[in-house]
Amino acid sequence: MPDRRTLLICSCEDTMPLAAAAFERGCRGADIVSGRQLCRAELERVRSLMVSGARITIGCTQEAPLFREIAAESGSDVSFVNIRESAGWSAEAAKAGPKMAALVAAAAVPMPDVPFTQIESAGVALVYGRDERAIEASSLLKEHLDITALITRPDNLMPPRTTEFPIVKGTIRAAKGCLGAFEIIVDDYASPRPSSRGALIFGPARDGAVSHCDILLDVSGGPPLFPAADLRDGYLRADPGDRAAVLAAVLRARDLVGSFDKPRYVTFTADLCAHSRSQIVGCRRCLDLCPTSAIAPAGDHVAIDEKICAGCGQCAAACPTGAAGYALPPADVLMRKLRTLLTVYRDAGGVSPILLIHDEDHGGALIDALARHGDGLPANALPLNVNEVTQIGLETIAAAFAYGAAAVRLILRAKPRHDLAGLYNTIALAEPILAGVGLSGERLATIETDDPLALGEALPRSARKQRSRRQGP
């Protein structure tokens, strides 16, 4: 354990076993407190421990908001880890004690504060569309945002009885920026004549009009204005034929006013960058991999726009010099957590661990659903939650096997939100290295699915294969 802590583990009303012996073997030096219903009937036990000033790790994430309220009263240092869906709710729960101990120990590894950059939005919004649907969306937002509607094909568009927001015509030729700082270039730009009667009639048009806005709502039905459009903060896109999707985008746009703290996902040391010297281009890895085009050449090095960066981490994973480093968490902290997870699992009696790397929104949700509606994870599948699976580089994969992993699986979406070329390149580089040290076969692979039951079907096969290899000559 990184420091002496009190571990609170709960059987959740006897729906999962608690292997006390495994916790004692794996979490030496920690005070282990077990319960049956710590969030309700035994809540005062939790409160008294928090008042005592103990550092506490609670094996429950479902009731974390309640426990945080109590911790705030006493200023207690508390962290949380999911051992129920990750281990306890499983067809192999009886053998999951070592995994539970490993998950709790890894959760106690101290995490550094997340660095942030601030984004300001004054609520100036442009609704870009092709017909009345854009006007309807603008009308829903007019009381909340400073709205302008830009229509690409304003044929037979009824003039409003009262001009409550500007309606102009034009086609966006180019767009750049992000929440609070969009810049668009519009061709065929024109304003309507105030004398328009049966339909809006527009004045003389011009190309190259420039406009700035904080929020860009795109209901044009055309191609996205940005690469990896779903990752561009402040750019909301919906199919104009899907009223529910348009309404959802409107509701999201309404909330994008004020100051926002965005994580600074990547740290960058320009002096280490090998992009260019004497006007001769050397390394382009990050430029070629960035899905949002947040990276651009800047002389002998590159520059990363932290407000556009969506945090995929492929630049840091591919950087050959360490100029770009991932910050959520930094690589050395992730290594400590990985080492703790695998060594405690072994110390607690676990064998043949399969490291299951996943993000929270997708992989975490699949694991949760598999536990609730399927057989749960195998006892030797150790989930490691990271910010983005694509942040994983060769050093993490090598460390996982060095610390004792029998296999590594990376959970990905069936339809990724951005190109995964960087991750695939890392896997292709790692495979011959693993084979060279005798780790051949399906040691490293992705599981690309949005179906929790498909995840469940993939993992037991992996578990059986790795166990059979370990038992072989």
Task: Describe the residue ranges of each PLM region.
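Structured core of small recognition/catalytic domains
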Residues: R153-K176, I184, P320-A324, P329, ...
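C-terminal, active-site-flanking charged/polar segments
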Residues: G393, A399-L410, P416-V437
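Residue-level detector of anion-binding/catalytic polar loops
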Residues: D77, I147, G325, A406-A407
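Ferredoxin-type iron-sulfur electron-transfer modules and their immediate structural context
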Residues: P2-L289, S293, S352-D368, L384, ...
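Active-site phosphate/pyrophosphate-binding segments
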Residues: I308
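Short, structured secondary-structure boundary patches
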Residues: I167-K169, L338-L342, D347-G350, T426-L434
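Flanking helices and flexible, charged tails adjoining ferredoxin-like Fe-S electron-transfer domains
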Residues: Q118, A249-R252, D271, H275, ...
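Iron-sulfur cluster-binding cysteine motifs and their immediate structural context
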Residues: M50, K142-D146, V281-D305, Q314-V333
